[in-house]
Amino acid sequence: MKFSNYPITEEVKKGVEGMGFSKPTDIQFKSIPAIIKGEDVLGIAQTGTGKTAAFAIPIVDKVFRSSIKGRKDGVRCLVMVPTRELAQQIQEVFKSVSKFTTVKSFAITGGVEQDPQIHKLNKGVDILITTPGRMYDLISQGHLSLNRVNTLILDEADRMLDLGFYKDIEGILGRLPKHRQTLFFSATINAKIKKLAYSLVNNAIRIQISPKDPVSKNVRHYVTNVEMDDKRYFLENLLEQNAERKILVLVRTQVRAERVVKAMERVGVDSLIIHGGKEQSERNSALKAFKAGDCMLLIATDISARGVDIPDVEIVVNYDLPDLVENYVHRIGRTGRGKQKGEAISFVAEGEAPLLFEIEKFLGKKIQEIEVSKKEYQTILDLSNEKSLGDLLSQIEFDLENESPKKKRKQKNKKK
C-alpha cells in the first residue's frame, strides 16, 4: 500500500511525498491505520524503523482536520521524549509532514533561553515536543497549559525510565484530560515498561516489530584487546588509517567524553563532542558540523546519541563497552543503514570481558578479534604524537642545554 492510498488529507500527503516517502515501513503500515481510527497504540520498535513518521503522519492529519473545522487554541498533542536531540529531530519530522498545512509544532527543551520559548507558546502551538524538565518549569510558572491535549505520545519510553523520569511521567497524567489518545513507543519491553504502558493506554493495540537479526547485516563487528589507558593511542592509530571516513566514538560518561576529546587535541586531531553537560546550542552546532562533514570525528555519550539521526557514519567505535547489551545494538545502529556498509570496532580492556561475553551471547556469535602482537602493540604506542611527561621533561632539559649563549646572557642581566 502506498501513502497516496491512505485516508489522509492531500496537504499531508504532499508533505510526506516531499520527504521522499512512497511506501510505509512495517511500523508505519501497522500503526498509522490504528492511530487514524483513534486507537491507543503500544509500539515496540527500534530506532531506524521509521517510528517517528508512524505517529507524526496521522497526528498532523488529525490536528489539521480539526483546525479546518475550527478548533480552539491550545496544545493539542504532547510528545514526551528523553533527550534534547531527540526532541529536535522529532520536531524536524513534524515540520516536514506539516509543511503544506497550518499545523504548528514546536520543540521545548532545557539548555536554551526560556523567554523565546514562552514567546513561541504564546503565539500558538498545536503539537509540543518536550523533555520533562523544561516542560514542568513552564507549567509551574503558568506559561503552559495542557487541558486541551487530546493526544499524548511517549517516545523512547525505555530510555525515559533509564533516566529516572518515571515519576515525572506519572505526574503529567493529572494535568491531562482523561479522554485522550495515548501512543506509547519503546525500543525494548520489560515488566517496568509494561507497568507504565498499561497505566497510560486503554485497550491498546500492541504492535511489535522484531527483526530476525537484532543488528544490521551490513555491519562488520570487530574487537581489539587494549589496556584501558592505551585506548587513546589505538583510537589515534585508527583515525590515521581512516582519515577520510566519518567516525562516531561512543563512551559511557560525560567525563570520559571530555578526556577523549582532550587526548585527541594533544595529538592534533580535530573532534566534535555531544553530551548532556553541553549547552543545547553547542550540541546542535556539533551535530550540524558532523552531518555536513566539516569534522569527521564525533565523540558522544549513549544518552546524547540515543535516537539521534546521524547519517553516513562509516565506523562506530565502542571506546568503552556499554553496560547494557541493548545499548550495543543502539550504538552500532548508527552505521550500516539502508544499503550502506559499516564497521563496529570495540576497544576491550581486561575488566570489560564480562560485558563482551554478554554482547556475544546476545548476538549468538563470537565477534571477530583484530589480533595485535606485542610488537605491533608497542609500535602503536611509539608512533603516537602524544608525548609522555618523561618525554616533555627530556625535551625541556634538551632545550635548556642547547639554549644560545646570547639568550642566557640576557636572562642573567635581567636577574641583576
Question: Where are the regions that the model predicts?
Answer:
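Basic Arg/Gly/Lys-rich low-complexity intrinsically disordered segments
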Residues: 1, 69-70, 292, 370, ...
